[in-house]
Amino acid sequence: MEKISLVTGGSGFLGSHLVDRLIESGKHVIVADNFFTGSKSNLSHLIQNKQLEIMRHDINFPLYVEVDEIWNLACPASPIHYQFDPVQTIKTSVVGAINMLGLAKRTNAKIFQASTSEVYGDPTISPQSEDYLGNVNPIGIRSCYDEGKRAAETLFFDYNRQHGVNIRVARIFNTYGPRMHPDDGRVISNFIVQSLKGMPITIYGDGSQTRSFCYVDDLIDGMLLFMENDKKEKGPMNIGNPVEISIKEVAEMIIRMTGSASKIVYKPLPSDDPMQRCPDISKAKNILSWKPKINLEEGLEKTITYFRAKLA
């Protein structure tokens, strides 16, 4: 019998790539999305596919469907988007988690939570392992996202302990690739769009802060392996690329790869912006035998090709 997967936020950057893979594996997929940051164009190639069902739905309201598994990806994930309506952002993480966990409890569905490396705050150790408790600011301008995701993790583990809900909690690190929103303010999409348009490349701070960037195909591989793992591992589990690089180096790399004449300009660093972000993926390696395969240059090439076509 065909398995039914619910993907909240399924028209977004990560969600749409996940939907592709679930349909390829033969599952019937229900996408629930309010299209605040997602786009139907990310699913346009599947619109005639009978395995796909799309519904406009905000997970702040309960959803009554029969499903075998739930992938909870719904939430604005870039500072520009999540700071636009911070109250709605934290509600989506918390109330949305309660509604999806309630659905999982009722239908006996396995449920995946797309948590984030932001739960570690501005880390004082690097790389960050899952047992690092973080260096966080619960009242800062980023807290609507960071603290919402932390609260969602609490809810997931309490539903597991109290109600036996079968959970998977992944802490997702910086991810990039085709279908990123061109105006979402994330480092790689910003730099590529600015380079292709010949605009100045904007770096916040002096560019010495580091990130580790995982190509979207690698990330989805890790998510699928985690959901299906036969060791019943619940998480939390870091999924990301452990290769660290400075923001300035990324900007220079993209300028070179696009052949752009763009110059770098520096602006003040926003409040609570982490200086380091790098995952310890030992747990994913040991339990899932997973590690990223696509290096940054290869992934950037694919992403630049996508944005060239998008901006043409």
Description of each model-found segment:
Residues 1-175, 217-220, 290, 302, ...:
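N-terminal Rossmann-like NAD(P)+-binding domain of SDR-like oxidoreductases, especially those catalyzing
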Residues 38, 84, 92-95, 143, ...:
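Residue-level signal for the nucleotide or nucleotide-sugar donor/cofactor binding architecture
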Residues 50-52, 130-136, 164-166, 192-203, ...:
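A short C-terminal helix-loop "cap" of Rossmann-like NAD(P)-dependent dehydrogenase/epimerase domains
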Residues 104, 160, 195, 203, ...:
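Hydrophobic pocket-lining residues that define ligand/cofactor binding sites across diverse proteins
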Residues 124, 150, 165-166, 175-190, ...:
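Glycine/proline-rich active-site loop of Rossmann-fold NAD(P)-dependent oxidoreductases
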Residues 216, 236, 268-292, 302:
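Conserved C-terminal active-site "lid" loop/helix of NAD(P)H-dependent oxidoreductases
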Residues 246-258, 299-303:
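PAPS/PAP-binding and catalytic site of the sulfotransferase fold
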